[in-house]
Structure formats: structure tokens, C-alpha cells
Amino acid sequence: RMIISASRRTDIPAFYSDWFFRRLEEGYLYVRNPMNPGQVSKILLNQDTVDCFVFWTKDPGPMMERLSVLDRLGYPYYFQFTLTPYGADVEPGLPHKNELVKTFRELSARLGPERVIWRYDPVLLSPSYTREYHFQWFSRLCSSLEGYTHTCVISFLDMYRKIKGRMDRIQTRAMTGEDMVSLASFMGPEAERHGMTVRTCSEAADLSGFHIQKGKCIDDQLIAGLLGRPLDVKKDSTEGGMRLCQERGYRRYNTCPHLCRYCYANFSPDQVEVKRRLHDPGLSPFVRPAHREERITVREMKSVVCPAGDGRCALHLTFRRMGNRNRQHLKMNTDGALI
């Protein structure tokens, strides 16, 4: 079994919830290796294979009316809701902040504050977005979300090569150690004042002196609480700290119409438009490329839940190829690209 992370490379709740629920109804999805498009995995989706869904979104509104389907089927899930202080120069595809705050509150009222994580992420600096600007907006958002979440996750902008040109155009500057200390020394205590704990995501810096904990991309303690069982944890150095799982869920580059300037998963607005236009929620594939033969491997899923009676809480999740004896190879002519 597995934890499905949906998704850090696109916003499924905002744009692809119809597609998601159809995949759930069909009981499987395909995952294409982005580095090797000929490698495709078939992931089974049912109560026997899925431990939990983790949704990453900036606007869950389009999905909210259908969450009862997940409740009825008995799937544990929670949301990571990114709500930042930036304008249309940085986040051109988002609704107004007041509308997003309202959506956040509605989602929290439905699920409970422990199942809606607020992400103030990434923190970036420019002539328009100064430290003082962040002080003002972080305080305002803390006040607006007080009682609707217990956790705020922050991270500082990583200047990936593919986003540098975009960030240079809005005059984003490098974050210094002094900047981090100044921001952290305000954010930690301010969030506490509103009943929240601040955690970092994939940050090497130790900010514990400012009441900020080192966090994880996916919260094992929260999931353990949802499942009512301890999890088996393992360290993953790929994100500079502790992670819960290797993300092998719904993911594809150039598919998010939010078009946030800092997003590493979008590097061609034209491709985003093309893929959005070609998208058909009725197809298991995400978008349609030219016809070609694909080699599909059915993946074995290993649960992150500790066996009953196992007192350990060392947490891991692996997606590994099945042994030759148990591996199923399927060939298909597809009229759609797989995630």
C-alpha cells in the first residue's frame, strides 16, 4: 500500500478533480517516468493499495463538493493549502486572496484544522516583496486563519536554473542568512500567537531558536493519526532532510494553469495551454501525444503502516519494481500521455 501525493507538479484539486475521481472509479492510473517517457508504471487505486491521499493545492474549491466520495469510500486524506502574499506579477492564475481565505476556512470547517496545512511557501524577496511586506502579510494571514489550521509550513525560494529568468524579471534577490533570521524571528512567535506551529520544508537551516521546527514534505504524525496506526519512517536525503515518501503519484510538467513564476514544474506557458486544451478527464492518460507503443510495469506497493503489534515507528515507503517472477509487462498503443 502507499501514500499518494497529488501533486507537487500540478494542482489536481483546482484543475483536474474530474480526472482524479474518474481514475478512482476505474481503480488505476498510469505514471510515466518524466526522464524516460517509455517507462510507464500502472498504479492500482483501491482501499487495499492506498493508505492515504495528500492533496497539494492553491485553490481546492473545485474539488470540495466531491470530497464526500472519498469519505464514503473510506480513504484518509488531508490538504496542503498554499496561501501566499504575492500579487498577479508572481501568481497570475490565482483568485483574489480574500476568496482563497474564504475557501480555506470552508475546507477547514469541513475537515477540521488538523487536516488543512497552511503553506506560506516559497518566501521570496524583491523590491516589491520586502521583509517588511512579509511581516505585514504573514501577520494578516495568521489572523485570518486563526482557528482554521494548527500548522504553517514555510520554505525559502530555491532559485532553480529553469526559473531564474522569470525571477530576474521581477527582480527577485538572493536570500541571505540575515534575511532568514529576520523573517524567522518574526514568523515563529507571530504564528504561535495565533495558535499555530511553524515548520520548515526541505530547509537545511536550523531555525529552532525562533520557535520553528524542522518539518517534512508529508506529515507522518498526521497520517498516523488519521490511520490510527504508527508508520514506518525512513530518512530521504534527496530533499535535505526527512521525508515521508518518494512521490510516485500524479505528476506531470507544464500542466498547471496557475503559472506561478517560481514554479519549477512549469517552464513553458505555451505547453501548459496546449496540454490543458488536450486534456480529457475521461482518459486515464493525462494528455494525448502521438500513438506509440508503451511498456507498462504493474508496480508493487508497500504500506507505510507498521504491522499490528509492531511498536516501531520508523517510517518508509518504497515503490519498487516487482521481481521478474511476479512482474507483469503489458504493451498497449496509447492515444494519451501518461502522468
Segments (PLM) and residue ranges:
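Active-site beta-loop-alpha junctions enriched in small/polar residues
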Residues: R9-D11, K58, T82-Y86, D121-V123, ...
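Cationic, low-complexity basic patches in intrinsically disordered or flexible, solvent-exposed regions
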Residues: H329
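Conserved C-terminal portion of the radical SAM core fold
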Residues: E99-R166, S185-S202
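Catalytic cores of enzyme domains
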Residues: T149-Y253
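Conserved Radical SAM active-site core
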Residues: R1-V90, K97, K102-P113, P269-N326, ...
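Surface-exposed cleft-lining segments at the edges of enzyme active sites
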Residues: Y86-L94, P122-E132, M167-M175
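Local cysteine-cluster metal-coordination motifs and their immediate loop/turn environment
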Residues: R248-S268
